[in-house]
């Protein structure tokens, strides 16, 4: 317990954060404008009422200065002088300012933590998304069970504000934040439906992402804290997580919750083979141990969300499956562990033995159905995978149309070149190729057969299948047919194609 007390005192020794005055500085909103130059609400493309200018910011800051009280009732929100004649624009500008200001203390802590852990020096070597898969090939083959847990969502914003106060010490800032959220929508029902989440995320994308990521980071912090403090295996990579105050009270409460079910409260945390991954609203747990220990981890997450975030996960939807029989989705792939059995004949003197050997191999599969749904959503095909034309691109030149399709095909080919079976990838290429031909035929107001016969574009469109093999043959001096069957991970992919994600 002495170690926890020292940890708590060090967290309490942080200085006061003075974020409130920054909300009244014009350059903060200028930073928000520069950060969101390509998609910001500040751009003059929505109409006169939504045009951004420093004059609008100055008037908004003046109204914020003149506000006498910060906590008001919902009935008076429509009469409050805090908002101008354009409430939506004011709320968007203020939310951008809130997002910029509230990120400042976290960026400061993150930079200091990364410098202490010396992660920045080696970060350049691990930027690629594909660098994850060689790691999984080494680790997942030794694991036996996996569990997909949907992160409970949405959550009431009052809980997020209370948790945020543990990290940032600035009472006026949080009063103004509550005022902004109260004026924007009904506080009691805010973020309790998917419709309200969609509306808020579209109007205030930066603030929404911060609040959502903060919620996820908070429960992961508690998870990692208990994982490292109660285990003899202290992992240095976990040092990037921040310190927080009032954690002993939460830890004691968690101990009381588990004391009813477990005789040794924290012994189940000592699982050196547990692996945790968060991806697209899910947290994936994989372990080598028996399902009983995985079940304890599942109940830990359920109690954590219920006790500290007042959200109710669905325990019946959390299944623990053998990794050899269950596939889970990660970074646009379907992953599972396949057991390859081989029989070896061994002979000693006059005796002959047949030995059966099982070798685990990570199977990385291209998710063909989600990709077809993504192609249908992007209007390259229908829901059954039948290619259709793209009339929106018909105004471009033939070269630009072919180049667009080739770039999409090339990106998908690079991203999925590490898959175990490439037949699904060839089908996606085929859909894009026919969609390109139909788009060109639609532009020239002709049929596909007549267009190919007249223009001779069939040879040009062969690049969909020949370009990748030609590039690989230049890089690797080996047989091209062998290269096409092998997995190739590219270490220069920093983000995935939009078609990869179907959610």
Curated annotation (Swiss-Prot):
One of its GO terms (molecular function) is RNA binding. The keyword Chloroplast applies. It is found in: Plastid, Chloroplast. It comes from the Eukaryota. This is Maturase K. Belongs to the intron maturase 2 family. MatK subfamily. InterPro entries: Domain_X, Maturase_MatK, Maturase_MatK_N. GO terms for biological process: mRNA processing; RNA splicing; tRNA processing. Keywords: Chloroplast, mRNA processing, Plastid, RNA-binding, tRNA processing. One of its GO terms (cellular component) is chloroplast. It comes from Lathyrus vestitus (Pacific pea).
